[in-house]
Amino acid sequence: MSTATTTVTTSDQASHPTKIYCSGLQCGRETSSQMKCPVCLKQGIVSIFCDTSCYENNYKAHKALHNAKDGLEGAYDPFPKFKYSGKVKASYPLTPRRYVPEDIPKPDWAANGLPVSEQRNDRLNNIPIYKKDQIKKIRKACMLGREVLDIAAAHVRPGITTDELDEIVHNETIKRGAYPSPLNYYNFPKSLCTSVNEVICHGVPDKTVLKEGDIVNLDVSLYYQGYHADLNETYYVGENISKEALNTTETSRECLKLAIKMCKPGTTFQELGDHIEKHATENKCSVVRTYCGHGVGEFFHCSPNIPHYAKNRTPGVMKPGMVFTIEPMINEGTWKDMTWPDDWTSTTQDGKLSAQFEHTLLVTEHGVEILTARNKKSPGGPRQRIK
């Protein structure tokens, strides 16, 4: 999936043995191979591949690295022929996969990229109902997720790179004895999703530098003692924010808030989308249809699927003990999306802005509990629109 090298930071070298990961964009697995790209070697770059077949299958994307003027320190676009919809572009090379201590419990995809238990559960197509002892553990994971997101959000400012934010999230996650759920999930290369401006979701942290006036979504997920937490918020970068960015972001924030108010036993998952889209439309925005909320807890993603758009046909009724996310992606322009050649980054087709907010929620006997709720010290928060 990602382009990774064997380079590690000095601190990592001092405390951990170097782990080698395949540099293939569609691979990224740990390997003991010593097969190196000869072109990279001439430029002082060490890029290792699993075998000849992996090298040949990934070479078309990998060769973009050879065009970097300053080796690993020089930022470059790995997809120079790709027609981006807006100004945000991939900025490579990606930093190497970050180390997770051996003693931290890991989900099954940490080893090979495949969430086998999740795939097996998907075939059952049932919505988990969690017991009190399980809910206690999910609540703890969500509390840690909120801590990590707030720490990363406090560093959002002009001049910081999305990769630096990823490093913060990674370090704060493992400091708490948790595993960053996105890392190696279907070979996703990072511990955080960072979505800037027209990026809807699943942005890969790289050398992109945040600028005054940007908006950036930080999507944090972690795995702690067998359970996942999932939350995200969109933050303003600096103070000089356009009225379009303010309206799109605040509309998304409000859409999540009104959807949460509907959550209680007996509410259908289908009706959430009707109210979300109504509010978005009233504010001259649209709702992304490709991605949806989902069950979370024992699994990173599971039933129910929760679309955020109107007139959807998703089945299911809320019952006490259900845990899921609501995460409306609201666009300034068209609802239609497109995906970059990295097979992850989703952006608006028209290059206009997108904003998202997400909470993990527990249905109680009489309503809902926001497991990932903000606290008084949480960075960010609403701002007044500009008329």
Swiss-Prot record:
Tell me if ATP-binding is a UniProt keyword of this record.
Answer: no
Q: Which residues are annotated as modified residue N-acetylserine in the UniProt record? A: S2
Biological processes annotated in GO? negative regulation of gene expression; protein processing
Give the residues the record marks as binding Zn(2+) 3. Answer: D219, D230, E358
Q: How is its activity regulated?
A: In contract to the MetAP 2 isoform, is not inhibited by the fungal metabolite fumagillin, an antiangiogenic drug.
Q: Which cofactor does it need?
A: Zn(2+); Co(2+); Mn(2+); Fe(2+)
Report residues binding Zn(2+) 4: D230, H294, E327, E358
The family database entries (PROSITE patterns) matched by this protein are listed as:
MAP_1, ZF_C6H2
What subcellular compartments does it reside in?
A: Cytoplasm
State the InterPro entries in the record.
Answer: Creatinase/aminopeptidase-like, Pept_M24, Pept_M24_MAP, Pept_M24A_MAP1, Zfn-C6H2
Listed GO cellular component terms?
cytoplasmic stress granule; cytosol; cytosolic ribosome
Q: Which cysteines are joined by disulfide bonds?
A: none
Q: Which residues bind Zn(2+) 2?
A: C37, C40, H62, H66
What detail does the entry give on cofactor binding?
Answer: Binds 2 divalent metal cations per subunit. Has a high-affinity and a low affinity metal-binding site. The true nature of the physiological cofactor is under debate. The enzyme is active with zinc, cobalt, manganese or divalent iron ions. Has high activity with zinc; zinc cofactor is transferred into the active site region by the ZNG1 zinc chaperone.
**Zinc finger regions (C6H2-type), where?**
19-73
| The family this protein is said to belong to | Belongs to the peptidase M24A family. Methionine aminopeptidase type 1 subfamily.
Assembly: Associates with the 60S ribosomal subunit of the 80S translational complex.
Note from the entry? Present with 19600 molecules/cell in log phase SD medium.
Functionally, this protein is described as follows: Cotranslationally removes the N-terminal methionine from nascent proteins. The N-terminal methionine is often cleaved when the second residue in the primary sequence is small and uncharged (Met-Ala-, Cys, Gly, Pro, Ser, Thr, or Val). Plays the major role in N-terminal methionine removal. Less efficient when the second residue is Val.
Annotated protein name in UniProt: Methionine aminopeptidase 1
Q: Which source organism? A: Saccharomyces cerevisiae (strain ATCC 204508 / S288c) (Baker's yeast)
